[in-house]
Swiss-Prot record:
<dbReference type="Pfam" id="PF09180">
    <property type="entry name" value="ProRS-C_1"/>
</dbReference>
<dbReference type="InterPro" id="IPR004154">
    <property type="entry name" value="Anticodon-bd"/>
</dbReference>
<dbReference type="Pfam" id="PF03129">
    <property type="entry name" value="HGTP_anticodon"/>
</dbReference>
<feature type="region of interest" description="Required for editing of incorrectly charged tRNA">
    <location>
        <begin position="1"/>
        <end position="223"/>
    </location>
</feature>
<dbReference type="InterPro" id="IPR045864">
    <property type="entry name" value="aa-tRNA-synth_II/BPL/LPL"/>
</dbReference>
<keyword id="KW-0963">Cytoplasm</keyword>
<feature type="binding site">
    <location>
        <begin position="401"/>
        <end position="405"/>
    </location>
    <ligand>
        <name>ATP</name>
    </ligand>
</feature>
<dbReference type="InterPro" id="IPR004499">
    <property type="entry name" value="Pro-tRNA-ligase_IIa_arc-type"/>
</dbReference>
<keyword id="KW-0547">Nucleotide-binding</keyword>
<keyword id="KW-0648">Protein biosynthesis</keyword>
<dbReference type="GO" id="GO:0005524">
    <property type="term" value="F:ATP binding"/>
</dbReference>
<dbReference type="Pfam" id="PF00587">
    <property type="entry name" value="tRNA-synt_2b"/>
</dbReference>
<dbReference type="InterPro" id="IPR002316">
    <property type="entry name" value="Pro-tRNA-ligase_IIa"/>
</dbReference>
<comment type="function">
    <text>Catalyzes the attachment of proline to tRNA(Pro) in a two-step reaction: proline is first activated by ATP to form Pro-AMP and then transferred to the acceptor end of tRNA(Pro). Functions in trans to edit the amino acid moiety from incorrectly charged Ala-tRNA(Pro). Has no activity on correctly charged Pro-tRNA(Pro) or Ala-tRNA(Ala).</text>
</comment>
<feature type="binding site">
    <location>
        <begin position="390"/>
        <end position="394"/>
    </location>
    <ligand>
        <name>ATP</name>
    </ligand>
</feature>
<feature type="binding site">
    <location>
        <position position="480"/>
    </location>
    <ligand>
        <name>L-proline</name>
    </ligand>
</feature>
<comment type="subunit">
    <text>Homodimer.</text>
</comment>
Length: 746
């Protein structure tokens, strides 16, 4: 059991973060529960030995797959021995076996020994079928893990069902009989869990003989290495445990590798670098000052540029009536599942439901007819910086997919199509600059397919980014040509020069705080955040290095001189003169937060009238004379931005595979690539391609680490390769119209 010197249960931080997020989601659904902390319990046997009250209510949970890679989460009573062959017959499948640890983590984002029905919330692709033993129906309360095995929840059975249903996973019920004739088949992964539990106990006993608090923290950091070793069939000795702990003593740093566990890496980076703080409403997050500073930087750039296009800032209300919101049917269909409604004030019901804006087209366009009467009133160009709410129940990801987010949304009205379309692409190019010049992120400009375009638009232009570590594209920004669709709905007309009534041609365009998440995913590394200089609050951190015989006052004065030189040149920097922390601690502290440049000053630097400059992006060091510090720093900031962009651009380019037949697609997708394919652009093929790639993803048998998820059209790139004569569509065989970029996406 993991205890500190006071006898308190110590739960690893990464597990605490998971359970805190879960608890917020449960409370949001008005679900009550009682948590009992008991220390590590990797198996049912361990949990039963904890002597919990009503232990017969502890559920046994099995994560299984069949030969065709259909996935099943089975929940039954803890005293039942399950025969997988018999269970295969019940589920009308064959060859059921336990899912390996990699896929357990990839699909349900959970570690062995931590499984519970609540983990179904992490099934982002909706590929897992949830089954409850029929006997669970008769249980008033169950005992399950809160996504980790250091505590258990006492929770009403109906509330567990309610929670699963809220994530679109209503359980099906099956009759699971006790296998009394023979032991059920047990996968080796259960043996691995037993070994992991033994090894954890061995470590904890050893830790308790030394320094409980510090040793246990180091033990948590080294957990991934321990698991890897056990999975290879080796149980660590006491000495080996101590050796491994000493290799990873920085408990404040990032403990997951970006390439190995991207989701956990991302969560650690945004929290430990002090960008995000979790909130008690799922999908809503606190943007801390470092994150909001990034938003202010891109906001200042965009404001300056749109004003050159004669766009004016304004603000429209947060609320919209149901009648107004539903006026444009095609438009609202895309948002209706996500709209949050206000139905009460105090204890009274509102006479009419009021929606919280998911976007502002219908809010703004209802007043446009009052402002636009003549061609002299055009063009009307407005922008607003605000928040919107989209109450979706997909797995939230800070910055990337949230229920409330900051954005800018622009809306314009023009007298003709030519003028409106020009603005659409002018704005799209500003989004390119937003990403390239400030976030050092390359994007692909293109046009959305008919099935992916904005509801109510004639066409949608898009900026697409790509995260090579997990093989997923992200829509970075969009700019829409709405034609006269909304003008006809809201009767936005003007009298032209010939006194003829015409409908206005409209545009709308937006970019969100998602851009910050894309930047983090693109540049971050195993040390933490990597900030492009143009959005880093502090460009430079100055760290003094003292020894016992050091003249601290002299070094302090020297560092202050460098600080003054940089600040006088408008380079914001911070002098870290904290006396209670070592230089190494300070290095890690600022590397985690992504500060572009570190300047080190020690006794030798003082003697040589120099300093050491270290780049965050590539860890290169150089010795620089004091008189050259300003010029070197200025050039280095430029070089860092350029290097970050070029490195990301190469990753993006290397992630595109050109294909001409569908047989080439899955190989590319499973290598975390996008595919550029000749396409007929038939809207019916979009859903066909999604379904087939989803099916093939689940049925892959050649690799246990195959990625899952459907492929969809991301965009038709504006920069088109030459199309050979008579080229056929890679899917339908019909004549191809253009090259289209396909891939998995967020």
């Amino acid at each position: 059991m993991n205890n500190n010197t006071n006898g308190e249960i110590i739960i690893p931080q990464e597990y605490l973060e998971k359970s805190e997020c879960l608890f917020k989601e449960l409370k949001e659904l008005n679900i009550n529960f009682k948590e009992v902390k008991h220390g590590l319990a990797a198996t049912i046997k361990d949990l039963l030995e904890m002597n919990l009250e009503n232990s017969t209510n502890i559920l046994k949970n099995l994560f299984l797959k069949d030969k065709k890679k259909n996935y099943f989460l089975i929940c039954t009573l803890n005293n039942k021995t399950v025969d997988l062959k018999n269970l295969s017959n019940i589920l009308k499948t064959n060859n059921l076996r336990f899912v390996d640890e990699n896929n357990l983590n990839n699909i349900l984002n959970i570690q062995p020994g931590c499984l519970s029905p609540l983990a179904i919330k992490n099934d982002k692709e909706n590929i897992v079928k949830l089954y409850f033993d029929e006997e669970i129906k008769n249980m008033q309360e169950v005992i399950i893990h809160p996504l980790h095995n250091y505590s258990s929840l006492y929770i009403k059975t109906q509330d567990v069902i309610k929670f699963c249903e809220s994530f679109n996973h209503a359980p099906e019920y099956v009759q699971i009989k006790e296998d009394t004739t023979s032991k059920a088949r047990v996968d080796k992964k259960e043996d691995v869990q037993e070994e992991m539990a033994k090894n954890e106990e061995l470590q904890n006993n050893n830790n308790n003989n030394k320094n409980n608090s510090n040793s246990n923290n180091n033990n948590n950091n080294n957990n991934n290495h321990i698991k890897d070793t056990i999975l290879k069939g080796k149980l660590l000795s006491n000495n080996e445990v101590e050796d491994n702990k000493s290799k990873d003593s920085n408990i404040l740093g990032i403990t997951s590798k970006k390439i190995e566990n991207f989701s956990d890496w991302y969560t650690q980076v945004i929290v430990k670098s002090e960008l995000i703080e979790y909130y008690d409403i799922s999908g809503c997050y606190i943007l801390r000052p470092a994150a909001y500073y990034i938003w202010e930087c891109v906001q200042a750039f965009f404001n300056k540029e749109i004003k050159k296009l004669n766009v004016e800032n304004s603000y429209f209300p947060l609320f919209v009536t149901k009648n107004k919101l539903e006026k444009e049917k095609n438009h609202i269909e895309g948002f209706s599942p996500e709209v949050a409604w206000v139905t009460k004030y105090g204890d009274s019901n509102l006479p009419e439901e009021i929606a919280i804006r998911p976007t502002s087209e219908t809010i703004m366009y209802s007043v446009f007819p009052k402002w636009i009467r003549s061609y002299r009133d055009l063009p009307l160009k407005l922008n607003q910086w605000n928040t919107v709410v989209r109450w979706e129940f997909k797995q939230p990801t800070p910055f990337i997919r949230t229920r409330e987010f900051l954005w800018q949304e622009g809306h314009t009205a023009h007298k003709n199509e030519e003028e409106a379309v020009k603005l659409v692409f002018d704005i799209l190019d500003l989004y390119r600059r937003w990403y390239e010049e400030y976030l050092a992120v390359p994007i692909i400009k293109g046009i959305k397919s008919e099935g992916e375009k904005f509801g109510g638009a004639n066409f949608t232009s898009t900026a697409e980014a790509f995260i090579s570590e997990n093989g997923r594209a992200i829509q970075a920004a969009t700019s829409h040509y709405l034609g006269t669709n909304f003008a006809k709905m809201f009767k936005i007309e003007f009298e032209d020069e010939n006194e003829v009534k015409q409908y206005v041609h409209q545009t709308s365009w937006g970019c969100t705080t998602r851009s910050i998440g894309i930047m983090i995913m693109t540049h971050g590394d195993d040390k933490g955040l990597v900030l492009p200089p143009n959005v880093s609050k502090y460009k430079v951190v100055i760290v003094p290095i003292f020894y016992k015989t050091t003249d601290e006052n002299a070094i302090h004065s020297y560092c202050k001189d460098i600080e003054k030189i940089l600040k006088n040149a408008q380079i914001n920097c911070v002098y870290d003169d904290r006396a209670s922390y070592s230089p190494g601690y300070k290095f890690n502290h600022w590397e985690l937060r992504g500060i572009p440049i570190r300047i080190e000053v020690g006794p030798k630097d003082l003697q040589n009238n120099s300093c050491v400059i270290v780049r965050r992006d590539n860890n290169e060091k150089c010795n620089v004379k004091k008189e050259s510090v300003l010029l070197e720093t200025q050039q280095m900031l430029v070089d860092i931005h350029k290097n970050l962009f070029l490195k990301a651009k190469k990753k993006l380019d290397d992630s595109i595979v050109q294909v001409t037949s569908f047989s080439e697609v899955m190989n590319a997708l499973n290598k975390k690539k996008m595919v550029l394919a000749p396409w007929c652009e038939d809207i019916a093929t979009e859903e066909e391609i999604k379904k087939e790639t989803q099916r093939l993803s689940l049925n892959q048998t050649n690799s246990e680490t195959t990625l899952s998820g459907a492929m969809k059209p991301l965009c038709i790139p504006l920069d088109q390769p030459p199309m050979p004569p008579n080229m056929k569509c890679f899917w339908s065989g019909k004549p191809a119209k253009r090259w289209c970029l396909f891939g998995r996406s967020y």
